[in-house]
């Protein structure tokens, strides 16, 4: 992952898959009156403030209890300005979610490419995701907990995002040497279990402890493919991969 904290950049809409995240705080409020700033700057500033406000408000209240009024108050913008940028609360949430998900996806991919063997690729990708979620508790809740509570298109988008990790795991099927082939639902079951464990920790206020799950999660993932002994050996190795 890029150096420094990604939270400010993510909340301001700055996280992109092709760009590193950098330290940043929420966008400052625009000065009142005739400021002479370019319209493009004003528009971008407003959008960033709205997304920042959504992340903060959802972290405090949860998605379902958050209203457009809460968001506009936190962003210091009018309802009219909000609807100039987003069709509704769901669209605003999805904009924030996609930026964070894209960043995590790109970071995991970059980490995995640093290793030639599939087991190490899995470990590197998972370590990168856990590190990001542990360092950004508000964004961890945004992208792992709230989509399930929100339901609808947000939950559907979250399920689609989780398929990225399913594809990473399916690449390991040639590693399987057992007599019986792996069940078709193996990867979906593994990802579902991983997500459930991560959500449990975030919901309990233990986001900062997420990286401690890495050995157990790696062992859980690799066991069906490599067998329990080899999976445990790789999971307990001290050489933790990084994406920095």
Regions found by a protein language model. Give the residues of each.
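Helix-turn-helix
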Residues: 57-91, 95
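Basic, helix-initiating cap at the start of DNA-binding domains
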Residues: 2-61, 68-74
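C-terminal peripheral helix-coil segments that are non-catalytic and often amphipathic
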Residues: 1-34, 131, 167, 171-174, ...
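Amphipathic alpha-helical segments used for helix-helix packing
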Residues: 133-152, 166, 170, 199
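Short, structured motif recognition centered on aromatic/hydrophobic residues
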Residues: 63, 104, 139-143, 194, ...
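Short, basic, alpha-helical segments at the C-terminal edge of helix-turn-helix-like DNA-binding modules
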Residues: 68, 97-105
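Amphipathic alpha-helical packing segments from all-alpha helical-bundle domains
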Residues: 152-175, 184-196, 212-220
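Hydrophobic alpha-helical connector segments
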Residues: 109-138
């Amino acid at each position: 992952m890029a150096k420094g904290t990604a939270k400010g950049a993510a909340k301001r809409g700055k996280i992109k898959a092709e760009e590193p995240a950098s330290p940043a705080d929420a966008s400052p409020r625009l000065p009142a009156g005739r400021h002479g700033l370019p319209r493009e700057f004003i528009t971008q500033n407003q959008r960033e403030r709205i997304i920042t406000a959504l992340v903060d408000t959802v972290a405090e209240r949860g998605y379902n209890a958050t209203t457009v009024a809460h968001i506009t108050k936190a962003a210091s913008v009018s309802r009219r300005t909000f609807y100039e940028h987003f069709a509704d609360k769901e669209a605003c949430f999805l904009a924030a979610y996609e930026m964070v998900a894209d960043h995590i996806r790109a970071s995991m991919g970059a980490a995995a490419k640093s290793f030639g063997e599939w087991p190490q690729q899995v470990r590197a990708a998972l370590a990168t995701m856990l590190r990001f979620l542990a360092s950004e508790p508000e964004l961890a809740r945004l992208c792992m907990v709230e989509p399930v509570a929100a339901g609808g298109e947000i939950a559907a988008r979250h399920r689609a995002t989780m398929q990225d990790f399913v594809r990473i795991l399916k690449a390991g099927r040639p590693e399987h040497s057992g007599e019986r082939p792996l069940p078709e639902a193996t990867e979906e079951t593994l990802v579902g279990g991983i997500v459930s464990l991560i959500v449990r920790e975030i919901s309990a206020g233990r986001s900062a402890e997420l990286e401690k799950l890495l050995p157990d999660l790696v062992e859980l993932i690799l066991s069906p493919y490599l067998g329990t002994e080899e999976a445990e050996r790789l999971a307990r190795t001290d050489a933790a991969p990084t994406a920095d």
